[in-house]
Amino acid sequence: DKKLFNDGFVDKPMDQYWAGPFKVSNWNSSEKVITLAPNDKWWGEKKPLLEKIIWRQMGIDSLRAAFKNGELDAAGFTDAATYSAVKGQNGTEIRSGQNTGVQNLQFNATRVTDLAVRRAAFAAVDRSQLADVTFKQVGWEEPMPGSMLAMPFQKGYEDNVPKDSGADAAKKILEEAGYTKSGDFYQKDGKTAGFSITTFGSDTVTQAKFQRIEQQLKQAGIKVTNDNQPESNFNSVVGTKSYDCTLSGWAVGANMADSPQYFYTKDINNGVGDDEIDKLIAKISATESKDEQIKLANQVEKLHMEKVAIYLPFANGPSYSAVKSKLANYGPRLFQTSYTDANLWVNVGWQ
């Protein structure tokens, strides 16, 4: 049923398709609130401890304020500003773990069309400085990630980011592509080497990261401007790819060989890519050996970062849950999901 597949869950709970311990009892898309209740058709041996779960979608500034005001029992976040704001609040605690995601600088290659500019930016960015800005307020340390596909602790992980880096390496890329220096910045055919970075909201850490990038790229002769948008514009701007470049974040899956198709095909990047890379990605799904799949995935990522240059990882980071202290069995959990363990939500309850 094509219509059911495409539209069946649009503003409809569709309880007959929920097989887990909870089902939808109220769905309010206009207020971005969904309420779950125990599923009377749940087949598991253990019954849920909670009588209901209310989920609310909100921006990070609103989430921070709502938790401080006692409107939320739990709030997940990764940013330093929220950590500082909610830390030490009476009757609450912060539970921390490894975030299974990657923060990255992400180009829209249909707008920043010159590969030389994208490659030069990759070389010019000092990723360690971005990680320092991101984590210094929370005391988090980690190895520098070199992949969009895997966490550094996962089997098969490799650092696939090009090794030639720094302002001189970036300048060499531009000059070999025919750019010449004019004042502070490089130019070619009357056009300045540069682009805008779209940021959202007023988060001080995000703005500090932009300033570091701006300084680093200026040293390499690349001009960067800040296209600062209201936080409420995030979905529309990112969804329509109305940006040159942005600071983004993606989840990392448990099997890295599943992920190249979501980052590195021409189709996923609006036609920008490489035929050789697409053939290698197709080969992954036709390969039986898991080890060979992982080798191919790393080969794909290395080639894409060198030949296409759209995604530049710079941090994995922590995962935090600010919770009321009496809430049990809830918090960061690495790759555990309700899809892999139905008891994940069954065991959440109040002490």
Residue locations for each model-derived region?
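Second-shell loop/turn segments in exported
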Residues: G8-K12, Q106-T110, V117-A120, K155-K163, ...
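Ligand/substrate-recognition segments at binding pockets and active sites
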Residues: S29-E31, T180-V252
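Append "and occasionally in soluble cytosolic enzymes with long acidic Gly/Pro-rich linkers
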Residues: A37, T113-Q215, Q299, G349-W350
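Ligand-site clamp/hinge motif
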Residues: P38-A85, K223
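Detector for C-terminal structural segments
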Residues: V125-G156, V205-E214, V238-Q351
